[in-house]
Amino acid sequence: MINAVDLHKVYQLKGREVVALRGVSLHVPQGEIYGVVGPSGAGKSTLLRCINLLERPDRGEIWVDGRNLTALPPPQLRAARRGIGMIHQHFALLSSRTVAGNVAFPLEIAGVPRAERRRRVAELLELVGLADKAAAYPAQLSGGQKQRVGIARALAPRPTVLLSDEATSALDPATTASILDLLRDLNRELGLTILLITHEMDVVKRICDAVAIMDRGSVVETGRTVDLLRTPGSLLARSLFAPPPVSGDGVVTLTWVDQAEEPLISQLTRLFDVDVSILGGALEEVAGHAVGRLTVRITGERSAEALTYLTDRNVLVEEVP
């Protein structure tokens, strides 16, 4: 659905070059929610602006829905952009227009007849849970409600792709959770492909099917969210989970997915006659999966066999130095 191929982007700033993107490539399958995370200045927002060609990359290609946007002439590019919606951290609503008027605005620009606009606006406000706010003005809305208006407006032209640039970073935790739940519902109901930029790991944990981690203009890690958590040395796992509370001989971290009901620790003590001390741990829901992580100290003559037993059962075992 979205393919970014070897993107490069350099800005000129006060007589010096600032490299924003260094050969960035990523693939977002149709119907997935794909997160791009990283620190400020990593190139995340530049990447997003290149996807819909608000910024044109110096080198590389952008493919959306089978079309190379970087090769399209202006009239065709404008038409292709109608299939790409975008929501922002700052809602950019028109204060002089009602909620319904804001949602209708892109349809007016596109020349959609008034009766059809009204039907579409009513449908969208129902979809985002604001059917009773059609006549309200932005100043009368909460931050979460304003973002819902922004989402409805982005969906007005019936896009197949939604780009989200830090859309929840200005919201409180409860409102953030409700917006993320809405995005997940839209993804499922409409088959919407969502590419979201965030610096919040809780966003990745809650809704992202796959993720790319960026740093200094490059993608340094990418893959399915759950698969990365089972990958030794994963940057994502280090970011999502607190570091082990202790280290030393026999101390390991155990990570497993969707195995919370298996009595793995009691099996170890029973089968291999080892002592297992639990030093810390957590059970989190990540991308719809139950992911567990324990830090334990295993001692006994058969401790190596016990660790092999865990590995054979798809538990990631990592020594804590």
UniProtKB/Swiss-Prot annotation:
Keyword Oxidoreductase included in the entry's annotation: no
Keywords linked to the UniProt accession: Amino-acid transport, ATP-binding, Cell membrane, Membrane, Nucleotide-binding, Translocase, Transport
Record-listed E.C. numbers: 7.4.2.11
A Pfam match: NIL
SMART domains named among the record's database cross-references: AAA (SM00382), NIL (SM00930)
Molecular functions (GO terms): ABC-type D-methionine transporter activity; ATP binding; ATP hydrolysis activity
Signal sequence residues: none
Parts of the chain that traverse the membrane: none
InterPro entries the UniProt entry points to: AAA+_ATPase, ABC_transporter-like_ATP-bd, ABC_transporter-like_CS, ACT-like_dom_sf, MetN_ABC, MetN_ABC_transporter-like, NIL_domain, P-loop_NTPase
PROSITE patterns: ABC_TRANSPORTER_1, ABC_TRANSPORTER_2, METN
Subcellular location: Cell membrane
Membrane protein topology class: Peripheral membrane protein
Top enzyme category: translocase
Function: Part of the ABC transporter complex MetNIQ involved in methionine import. Responsible for energy coupling to the transport system.
PANTHER family, per the entry: AMINO ACID IMPORT ATP-BINDING PROTEIN (PTHR43166), METHIONINE IMPORT ATP-BINDING PROTEIN METN (PTHR43166:SF30)
Protein name: Methionine import ATP-binding protein MetN
Natural source organism: Thermobifida fusca (strain YX)
